[in-house]
Amino acid sequence: MAVPARVPRRLAIVPFRGGSVVSEGLLTWTMLRGPAWIRLLPDVYVHRDGYRADDHRMWCEAVTLRLPTDTVLAGRSAAWLFGADVLARDAPVTVVLPPAARLRPHPRLRVVRSPLPEQDRTLVGGLPVTTPLRTAFDLGRHGTRVEALVAVDALLRRRVVKLPALRAYAADRPGWPGAPLLREVLAMAEPLSESPMETRLRLLLLDAGLGPLTAQHEVRTGGRFVARVDLAWPALRLAVEYDGDHHRERAHFRRDVARLNALRAAGWVVLRFTADDVLRRPDAAVALVRQALAERRAIETNH
């Protein structure tokens, strides 16, 4: 939608401080109270054409305008800005405040109080955030075990942080809250995990005692590449894959058929699971994999 001429161009799509633009003479308080402007936070506005209720970037920009000195975006908000798929729809913006800082509460804001040394702060896309290392460190020691692992895997996948560096960073901070959870997460973290649901499926199988398994295993026959599978027991030629909704698309479906036929010709058995299997029928999924493992081991033994 075209921006009306009376709307200053630099205020058309990004949040801004109301007091600042009024003092500059760009708008008046009466105009800001009109239907063209949305009040996001105290003294923070955005034009209605730039407003999206679930636009996390917009909310991060708005919150940044209200942040006290030495306070930055953190947690899942920082991870999302680094490109990690860890954010739920309508999630609040997470910020980390030094112990002495103050910030007015708001439903779209989640405040974490923690020491925040200079070396743990950086910029991404012009916004102040915790560094990738600090972001992974924080997410890996809070929340549920599965969500902590999902977040760490996602950041590792984006290659904004390396697992050895994260382990060293954590080892230097053994007394921080959540350290036992973080140690467990780092022991299971997998940089090759390609999606949050793949991480959940892998953890489900590991917790059931079905490991060890290999992530993103390349299947080859006679030196020729056949396919790469999500999770595998290479010696047994058994693979487990997570299928997201994109596998329903016609072109993707056709590629899947050809790929599965090639794996079958190479002597592999492939089990495929969806989000419903992992989240709603985990026991059935585990039982199916356990049975397949037993059958493949029996075949290998007989050979």
Where are these regions (language model features)?
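Surface segments flanking catalytic/ligand-binding clefts of nucleic-acid enzymes
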Residues: R9, P15-S20, E24-L26, T69, ...
